[in-house]
Each structure stands twice: as structure tokens, then as C-alpha cells.
Design a protein with these regions (language model features):
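N-terminal hydrophobic targeting/anchoring segments and the immediately downstream early-domain regions
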Residues: 1-60, 64-74, 321
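Active-site mouth loops of central-metabolism enzymes
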Residues: 2-15, 82-99, 179-192, 254-259
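Short, acidic/polar
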Residues: 10-24, 96-107, 189-199, 261-268
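Second-shell residues forming the walls of enzyme active-site clefts
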Residues: 30, 39-52, 58, 68-70, ...
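Substrate-binding cleft of extracellular glycoside hydrolase catalytic domains
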Residues: 54-101
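Short beta-strand elements of ligand-binding domains
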Residues: 57-64, 117, 302, 307
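Active-site-proximal loop/short-helix segments
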Residues: 74-79, 114-133, 160, 164-181, ...
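A substrate-binding/cap region within the structured catalytic cores of diverse enzymes
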Residues: 82-151, 155
């Protein structure tokens, strides 16, 4: 919500200022983070007000994969530690993964959320990677089964799962301080990692989050996957046949804003095939950049309508009110 207001300080309650901005900018969803959580009661009230302001039409999401770094744990509003993905993979198995999904979904639903950007399905390809620290592990087949069961648990609690991140960060390294995130994987290498994402989608995940990994051996340059039609359109849409919602990873990452303007990044993501753009540092410039691109013919109305159809389909079929 702070992006709507153009401020840096995390918003912990919403009122007329946010209501006015939601009327000005008809966004499809709001994502909250730990900084937005001041208390359990305040969080529930904020989520409720956001839906009231928009006639219950928003996706309201958070990233919670369980474990000690859950935003509900780190903010201090919950002491209910749900098994982390790493713990699930090491000792709890498929039944534990489903139970974790149920528990995550139940907690999110308690506060009014309808989206969880989980599970993290990346295959760990090197020691110390985010996939090793927070994911299921190194085996794609095992990751696939566990991801499927987490998604089933979330879905059974009426929470939309957003499986992440494709392509995975499993072997990526960052160039310099805040530079681009590079992986030397080929398209054949990526095929070895499809299963966790595809199984999560088959189990009911409504979102696929695209990473900012640059894959020069696939593209020939260092343009991030989130801005690459070779990834989103050629692989996800055409090869996989996926017609759900594609959302970018957070666009306030240094590997994006140090290389592209807010408008360039937003338009590039839509051109590449993304449907939703997650959390830019300057929402107004991103939003207006897309409008300008449509006016100039760089983006067609047909392309925008494709994304709107995917978004409305999830909201309507799943009865997110207002659709």
C-alpha cells in the first residue's frame, strides 16, 4: 500500500488516502509484508478495509512459506511456527507438506488474505543458494511432490497459491553490488527443473512468479527472465500451455531499477507475457508507463485484454466478490 501513496514508510493502517488512490489506480491486488503488520487486530482490519474500499475485488497476498521467518512470526503476532519447507523435505514428507499447506492457508484466511506466494519450488543447484536455505532441496522429483501437496493444502483452505520462482535462483550469482543475477543454465538445463512448477500448477496454483534471473545462454544477453518473452511466452505459455496468471518477482530489486526505468521495466514485463507486476518502487511511473505504451501502440489493447481475462477468470470462477 505504501507504493500507492508514494512513500517509503510501511503502511500499517488504511483510510481515506488509500481509498482515494485505489479509486485512482484500479489495481488487481495488494501485497503486504512484515513491515505492514503492527498487530493481529490491525492486520485484520487493514485487509478488511482494503476489500471494502474495492467492493471485495482484490487479491490480497503475502509471502509465507512457513518456518521461523514467516512474517507472522517475525512481526510478533503469532507464535504458531509452521514447518519450513526445508524441515518438511527432511523429515515430514508429502503428508507433512499437505498439513503445512493447510496450516498456512488457515492462518492466512484468519487475517483475510486470499493469496500466498508459496511454495518456493526452486531446485537447489549449489550450496548456500536461497533454494537450499528455504526450499525443498536438490531433487526435482521430490520438490515436485512436496510442492503439489503444499498447493493442495493451501487450495483446500481457499487460498490461491503462487508458486515461485521460475526460472529458479538455484545456481544464480549476483554481479557486483546489486547487479544483475546471472545463471549459465541452458534451455535443456531448465527442462530438468520444470516438474516442481508444473506439479504445483496441476495441483491448483493460480499464480506463477517469474524470477529476475538472467540467462545469457538462452537469450544471448543479460535481460532478466521477468522481462523475457523467451521465458514467459516461449516456455511458460507455449511449451507448458500455462494460461494462469504470471506475476513478476518484486520489481523493487536493484537488479531491475539500476538497469531500467520504472516504465521500461513495467512495459517490458507485459510485453514479455506477464499479467501482473509486483511492487515497484514508483507505482505511478510504472502505471503511467503502461498507459503511455498502449496509447503509442507499443502495447496493444488486445495484449492487455489477454491478461485481464486471465485475472478475471480466477476472480470470477473462485468468486472473489465483485466479479
Amino acid at each position: 500500500p505504501e507504493q500507492l501513496l508514494g512513500i517509503e514508510t510501511p503502511v500499517t493502517e488504511v483510510g481515506s488516502s488509500i481509498s482515494e488512490k485505489l479509486n485512482q489506480y484500479p489495481v488487481g491486488g495488494i501485497v503486504l509484508k512484515e513491515g505492514n503488520i503492527a498487530s493481529a487486530e490491525g492486520l485484520s482490519e487493514m485487509v478488511s478495509n482494503l476489500q471494502v474500499f474495492t467492493q471485495n475485488s482484490l487479491f490480497i497476498g503475502i509471502s509465507d512459506e512457513g518456518g521461523e521467518d514467516s512474517p507472522f512470526i517475525t512481526s510478533g503476532i503469532s507464535e504458531n511456527v509452521i514447518a519450513s519447507q526445508k524441515e518438511t523435505a527432511e523429515s515430514l514428507g508429502n503428508t507433512g507438506a499437505y498439513s503445512a499447506g493447510i496450516s498456512l492457508g488457515s492462518e492466512l484466511k484468519q487475517f483475510g488474505f486470499n493469496v500466498d506466494f508459496a511454495p518456493l519450488a526452486d531446485v537447489s543447484l549449489k550450496d548456500g543458494s536461497i533454494a537450499e536455505q528455504k526450499g525443498f532441496g536438490k531433487d526435482a522429483a521430490t520438490n515436485a511432490e512436496l510442492a503439489r501437496n503444499v498447493v493442495k493444502g493451501l487450495t483446500d483452505q481457499s487460498i490461491f497459491a503462487g508458486v515461485k520462482y521460475f526460472p529458479g535462483y538455484g545456481d544464480a550469482t549476483q554481479e557486483g553490488n546489486g547487479g544483475q543475477i546471472i545463471s549459465q543454465r541452458t534451455r535443456d538445463d531448465l527442462k530438468e527443473e520444470y516438474a516442481p512448477y508444473q506439479e504445483a500448477i496441476d495441483a491448483g496454483a493460480k499464480f506463477l512468479m517469474i524470477s529476475h534471473v538472467s540467462l545469457p545462454k538462452i537469450r544471448g544477453d543479460k535481460r532478466p527472465a521477468s522481462l523475457s518473452p523467451e521465458i514467459i511466452t516461449d516456455i511458460v505459455r507455449d511449451e507448458w500451455g500455462y494460461d494462469g496468471i504470471v506475476i513478476t518477482d518484486y520489481m523493487d530489486k536493484s537488479c531491475i531499477y539500476q538497469k531500467y526505468t520504472y516504465a521500461e521495466a513495467a512495459v517490458g514485463a507485459i510485453e514479455a507475457g506477464a499479467d501482473m507486476i509486483l511492487s515497484t518502487k514508483n507505482f505511478a511511473k510504472s502505471y503511467n508507463g503502461i498507459l503511455d505504451a498502449v496509447k503509442k501502440g507499443q502495447l496493444t489493447e488486445e495484449r492487455i485484454d489477454q491478461s485481464l481475462t486471465r485475472i478475471y477468470k480466477v476472480k470470477f470462477v473462485s468468486k472473489v466478490a465483485g466479479y
